[in-house]
Amino acid sequence: MNPLSAVFNSVVLVLLALGVTDVFFSYESSRCSMTYMFEYPQYLQIKLSKKVSRLYPLYELYLYGEGSYAEENKNLTLTGVPVLFLPGNAGSYKQARSFASVALRKAENIGNRYHFNIFTVNFNEELVALYGGSLRRQTRFVHECIKTILSLYKNQTFPPESVAIIGHSMGGLVARALFTLKHFKPDLINVIITQATPHILPVLSTDIYLTDFYTMVNNYWIYNSLKLRNITMLSVAGGYSDYQVRSGLTFLPTSSFHTSALSVVSSAVPITWASTDHLSIVWCRELVLVTARALFDLIDEHTKQINIDPQSRMSVIKHHFVRHPAKHLESRHQITASFTETPKFTLVEDSKWTYTVNKESNESFFLFPLLDKRIAYSHFHCQNTFLYTHSWIFGCNKTVSPKCLQINDLSWETELLPSAKVVNLKLDVYSNLSHFILYIPATNGSKFSVECEFLSEEARTVHVPVTHVLSFGFSSSHAPLNSSGLLYVIQFEDFSKIYQAFNVFIVRNCGQNKESKSSIYKFHVPWSHEDLIGVLSDELPVRISAKLHAEQPQNDNRLVKLFLYASPECLHEVTISTSFSQILGQIVRFHGIYLPVYIVANLLLAYGAQLHSILIQGSCMDLDLSFDVAAKPYKVDPVLIICKYLLNYKWFKNYWDGLMLPQLDAVQLHAYGFWFPLASLFFFIFGTSIAYWSSIGLQAAVRILSSLWIYLKRPSMFPKESKCITYRVYAETLFFAFISWRSCGTFSLLLVFLRYLSKVLILYSSMKNYVSLNAHIVKDTSSKQDSVKTDSDTNINSNQLTHHQPSSLEIKALDDCLKMHFTILHLNLWIVLLGLPSFIYWLKTLRYTIQLDPDPNRVSALVLIFILEILMNSTTSAIKSSVCLKTAAVLQLPLSIIVVAFGTLHLYRISNLIAFSLFLHVVCCFV
């Protein structure tokens, strides 16, 4: 082991561990509360047709109910609005309980004017995120469920013609996949709400069925956007707390024709303002309440079904999930208002104004003239805390209505924040108005405050350049806010990349003033709905983890902003500095799943170096030394960078397509905004370190197991070279092939791996035993001790070597074989690891069927079984004189390049490329 390599790879591994720690542990504690219920949940199974039950014996459809509602609906005389819940990966149909219970309580609160019937599908908790072979089957079953659900409403006055769908995780993707079915009518679905659904790409592209399913669904929605424009889509992500599905994957693929789609992060959802993990997004009370309110507002009061107007539906969704004006949606049409008699106005001519009520107040109207303010100021900003009225700010044009009897309700421009309602009105937009009117209702025993000011946006905007990524947090940018304003806007310059991450500290100092109101911050990303909103504390500075879920679009010049709704009695200071650990976390969050690609690429380079050393030196190099020699990023990355660059030219693209080569994965990642120039370099180095230390760890495991093997069964014969193909090889190949064909391909590969491991253990134990035995005999001979004990030991040892006394050359040849077998074993291990998702799925369904169908690894497993069985009996001496050895050694570099080029988004291709690499070795054994 080279000490420098060990130290370097250790440091790299520590950096990777820091990134992993940031992803899995460095997020805010959950601010979600549990939903609660008053009655025990009941799930009434809906009887499906015999044909459907026969085709999908593992799937079921249920209707949710509680108490008297469940009893009333036992005969399935339904009168509500149908909503279908689709669970996701390993999800239970009982996850519908939280939303269904809240919806039932809300229906009771409004006197059951209308209500929802919540249906839920039992997918048998299938692991569809790991195995894509059952996604089409689930999609077809959901289609049958929708037809069955709608048939239950035939006797209604206004029977529903469509179903609203709530899909969690992969259930949301299944909902979108319904439209790809040949005989599916798009009118059967009007609203789809997905929760933590990876829409753009699979989290793990473990098999071809999964990637093909994604390609089919996304292409259909892009190419048929006009046809699907009446479908209202909402995708809700969990934020940084959801480390299983990062939020960037949940953003819906956009199209200029499909405008009825919206993607938000739960931390930006009004009233929720909390990040959720992958499971809590289903039961988070704050988010469930918002979802329930939105669905109730989607109902048309005349038909008591979901509104058929897609624009109205989208306005409802945006009202609840983007910007909540603290007003009921049902009064949206009331833009204008009027007074029957002239109210008593109080004229306010100051640029700053505060009104505080501690106990009681009379109804008041405050009039703010605009004419003399338009020159010096650009905006009128107001904040109120605990003022419980929906309409509180109006506009008046005294030219049209001299006594301001006709007014415009401007409260729709209000934004609801955690402890306040704020409004920021641009004076140029309201050039037709002469006055703003502030309405204070009569109160008794209420305590609230209202603060308003005219401000200049330019004077209140602070431009702060972010610190460089490589500053490692040693430098920072400061923005002291020493004036007594209500609103400040801090614009972060050059903050647009996904690999950027910063700590933003906000210090608030109110001195001795203990009665100051709260200050609120909003970290706003203008090109996606991923805002972070919170309240400042007087005791400790607030730290905001400023990073992006989505990269800035190419033609978007807007800047990331921090809005600070301040208390005028307090001083504030904003400091921003680079967070190195969060940068590593962003790299791992966006690209960590691609690590197996770079690990295998490094192993193939090291494997090629070993074959080359056999060709040149006649002996096999140690695997850890071969990493030092061959695992260099400049051998792989430049080729990919050049290809990616040339693909921008039409002539090269035509040549590429003429060779029928698949799309370069880096090009696709760049198109999604998930790639940056040094990503491949970083992960190649990470892959080298993992491959290096995993090889050392595997060697240590082999040593420990071999010691146990020697203790249990001491080898008595020195292993001799044998033919690559024997009757035993035929028998084992047929046995493992039968298992692969009748059960699961990865299961057979796991058995082959264990068989190969036993082969390596036997070889290592034999070499270790004979090396130690020879050393012991030499020591006894040189010392010339004639004690009885020594003589007896020597006789015993000599008897063990009676049949064959190995020479140093034979032991050296065995050592070379072990080095080569160990590398092949390591590659075999990664073949098994990459196939584990389908193996886990097969284990879960083993009680229903013994055969995995379809099996993504069956054919490749059959090929690999034959290859590995031959390689088990191969030796380095057998390939030294091979005419194909040089070709096999040279081709490992192109193979490693191909692994990175085409395996990043298609992990299942890696096993096939490893199989081809090992096949070249097999050829060397015979040619």
Curated annotation (Swiss-Prot):
Residues 26-595, 694-733, 843-858, 909-927 are lumenal. It comes from the Eukaryota. Coiled coil: none annotated. Its main location: endoplasmic reticulum. The active site is at residue 169. GO terms for molecular function: deacylase activity; phosphatidylinositol deacylase activity. The chain crosses the membrane at residues 5-25, 596-616, 673-693, 734-754, 822-842, 859-879, 888-908. It is found in: Endoplasmic reticulum membrane. Its EC number is 3.1.-.-. GO terms for biological process: endoplasmic reticulum to Golgi vesicle-mediated transport; GPI anchor biosynthetic process; positive regulation of ER to Golgi vesicle-mediated transport; protein transport. Residues 1-4, 617-672, 755-821, 880-887 are cytoplasmic. Belongs to the GPI inositol-deacylase family. GPI inositol-deacylase that catalyzes the remove of the acyl chain linked to the 2-OH position of inositol ring from the GPI-anchored protein (GPI-AP) in the endoplasmic reticulum. Initiates the post-attachment remodeling phase of GPI-AP biogenesis and participates in endoplasmic reticulum (ER)-to-Golgi transport of GPI-anchored protein. This is GPI inositol-deacylase. It comes from Xenopus laevis.
